[in-house]
Each structure stands twice: as C-alpha cells, then as structure tokens.
A protein has these predicted regions:
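Short, small-residue-biased leader/transition segments that mark boundaries at the very start
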Residues: 1-2
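Short loop segments at secondary-structure junctions
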Residues: 6-11, 19, 79-84, 100-102
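Conserved Nudix-box catalytic region and its N-terminal flanking loop in Nudix hydrolases
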Residues: 6-49, 54, 62-65, 69-70, ...
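Conserved hydrophobic/aromatic beta-strand scaffold that supports enzyme active sites
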Residues: 15, 75-77, 97
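Nudix hydrolase/Nudix homology domain
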Residues: 22-26, 88-124
C-alpha cells in the first residue's frame, strides 16, 4: 500500500482497479518478484511499472498464503517518492489517491490487501 500527504497534510492511499477485475473493485498494487531482485526492489519496480510512481521507505507488514497460483502474498507499505500517475493500461484500468473518508469498493476481509487498507484506516 502506497501513501502520500494530501491536502492539509491528510494522508492519502493509492488504490487501483486491475484490468482483470470483473467488478469496480479497487485494491493495492501487486506483482511478482523477478530473479535477482530483493523484495524492496520488487515493490519499487512493480509500482513504477504499473503507475509510474517512485517509492521510498518500503516496509514489510505481513504475509498470506494464496492458492492461485500457489503463491505467498507479501504485504508492504511504502511512501510516495515522486512522479505523476501514468498507468500501464494492460494491467491497471484506473488508479487514484483516496482519503480515508472516500474509499471506493475494496477487497473483502480475507485478503492481505484489505488488511493493509484496514491498518491504514486505523492509523488515521
């Protein structure tokens, strides 16, 4: 989950709608680690590839086994570094910075993405 300071220093989170989502669901960015990368590098690369943003302060939060495709999901937070939203339209239909009081439809409680969103909500 990616954060930045918004208007009046109110924190905002970046949520995205994946190209494969059947419903208008917004979630955290996600991806896979490539050979030769550490986890922090993978987070930075995936964010940049999907939305054109650089990140800083990448921090591990939690993990979750995921049955498809037999993966281990790793949840991280990161702070906005620089850049404007430039979407990889093959993977991302939409992305937006959201305040806590304006969340779109988000994943259900069983997902690690929801855990990251809930932790962010509790911090506010």
């Amino acid at each position: 989950m990616l954060f930045r300071s918004g208007e009046g220093d109110e924190e905002e989170a970046l949520l995205a709608r994946g190209a494969n989502f059947q419903v208008p669901l917004y979630s955290c960015l996600a991806g896979f680690v490539e050979p030769g990368e550490n986890l922090e590098q993978a987070v930075a690369r995936e964010v940049f590839e999907e939305v054109g943003i650089t990140v800083r302060d990448v921090t591990y939060v939690a993990s979750q086994p995921w049955p498809f495709p037999n993966s281990l999901m790793l949840g991280f937070t990161a702070r906005y570094g620089s850049g404007d939203l430039v979407l990889d339209e093959k993977e991302i239909l939409d992305a937006k910075w959201c305040r806590r009081d304006e969340l779109p439809m988000i994943p259900g409680s069983i997902s690690i993405a929801r855990k990251l969103i809930d932790l962010w909500m509790m911090r506010g």
